[in-house]
């Protein structure tokens, strides 16, 4: 049985869709799914949604939810990261500040000045997560779904080239 840790599991759409897709693979149907988020309310919503997917699909998978990142990561075989490092209200400034200075931003969280703003806020959090991965599940495969994806993946590769 594989253990898959979802860090930032409160991202309802991503988590629900990824779990649903993951469970279509026979080798993953008995997985232990460890949901982790710092927002207790959102974590509760996602836990109920994932429990429903498991129940309705009659999968033998197990699901836990925690606000403790170490608990979720311990002995994980895979780590899926879908975090938002700051409240969504902060994200608005990534669009409005460049706009005020007439800097065109075609995609507000992946490229241009806006993407750099978000990357600078998110990199320290991502690197902390990867430090924990190295400590608690060093053989895990890490899948990042957090934007700006390319900047964050590059930072992780430079800091931790041995993480998969």
Tell me what each language-model feature is.
Residues 3, 32, 62, 164:
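Residues at the starts of beta-strands that form the adenosine-phosphate
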Residues 26-28, 53-60, 160:
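Short helix-capping segments at alpha-helix termini
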Residues 54-78, 84-87, 105-115, 119-122, ...:
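A structured beta-alpha segment of the ubiquitous adenosine-cofactor-binding alpha/beta core
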Residues 4-33:
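N-terminal Rossmann-like dinucleotide-binding module
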Residues 27-51:
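NAD(P)-binding Rossmann-fold cofactor-contacting core
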Residues 92-109:
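A short, gly/pro- and small-residue-rich
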Residues 9-14, 40-42, 144-152:
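Gly/Ser/Thr-rich loops at beta-strand to alpha-helix junctions
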Residues 127-134, 138-164:
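Rossmann-like dinucleotide-binding core of oxidoreductases
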